[in-house]
Swiss-Prot record:
Similarity comment text for this entry: Belongs to the sulfotransferase 1 family.
Protein's recorded name: Heparan sulfate glucosamine 3-O-sulfotransferase 3A1
Phylogenetic classification of the source organism: Eukaryota, Metazoa, Chordata, Craniata, Vertebrata
GO CC term, one of those recorded: membrane
Stretches with biased composition (Acidic residues): 107-117
Outcome (variant: H186F): Abolishes enzymatic activity
Cytoplasmic side: 1-24
Amino acid sequence: MAPPGPASALSTSAEPLSRSIFRKFLLMLCSLLTSLYVFYCLAERCQTLSGPVVGLSGGGEEAGAPGGGVLAGGPRELAVWPAAAQRKRLLQLPQWRRRRPPAPRDDGEEAAWEEESPGLSGGPGGSGAGSTVAEAPPGTLALLLDEGSKQLPQAIIIGVKKGGTRALLEFLRVHPDVRAVGAEPHFFDRSYDKGLAWYRDLMPRTLDGQITMEKTPSYFVTREAPARISAMSKDTKLIVVVRDPVTRAISDYTQTLSKRPDIPTFESLTFKNRTAGLIDTSWSAIQIGIYAKHLEHWLRHFPIRQMLFVSGERLISDPAGELGRVQDFLGLKRIITDKHFYFNKTKGFPCLKKAEGSSRPHCLGKTKGRTHPEIDREVVRRLREFYRPFNLKFYQMTGHDFGWDG
């Protein structure tokens, strides 16, 4: 038999060589796929765990939760890595992202907050309430562990427009057990047909022991609002910030004037017939200040003990005192005290030494503290006479003399 030729020998030696190369290629491919899988798992883990880290630091409130080693808006607790059992749950959750609150409506409470440089007063800033305060959840780690939930509000600031509702809400947000929507939901007056599920979804997440709040000052003058809120929960606590109705009306007009400089004068809008001294109660700036009339609708659905009436004047002169009453009413520990405030002489009202989650002073923005136009003294006198009987009735109904007729 003839010995194998060169071609046959080459074919025989090439076969084991090709099998060896194939096995090496397969091994490298498996190693590459395994490495990619491990990298993917690690990347997913890092993304999931990034929430607590991001939540511990930050700049402006709109861009993210501000902080200084604590988590904004919640109990001041240090973030620690979860136990092994909790890590497993944590890995199954999507990466947490902040939700911006809905844009505020044009209802007269558009005030923003200004962040000041330490030692300065009235400096412009970049964070705000309403449209610019981010809903940074309290205890981000706890929320990532599915320990927080969205609840319907247990307390609502229902009024009044230009009474000081924005200031009250922002002061309350300093409290670690208060979680509030920054923007005004306007659910019970404009969006009721969207349903309670939609309303609940607007709320920030809360932990056990925390209170969910919102404020929409137009509720107080909305006829349907009392019945609608009662239908949601008869136990809802209601807060009304009231102010001298004459001053409130002028402030209301001043705000409108800043947006529409071509409107008639305050004096011409106040009277149906100035000669006869007949006040035009259909003008909203006047109508809102008839507090006793609006309160009657609320008392048909809520007992007076479930309503707290906050003085807008005292909120300026003694913010800590009024906040003490509010905290008691809400069943909260008195954490907000004098140490949280300083009086800004330039603006003429108190500011927070430390706003929610910030290490710098915050004041209500440029839209607050506008200079009021000069109003005819005779018009002011007639307005005071008009409001006096309504004020006296309001004092009797609430059991509190606000001193607007002194």
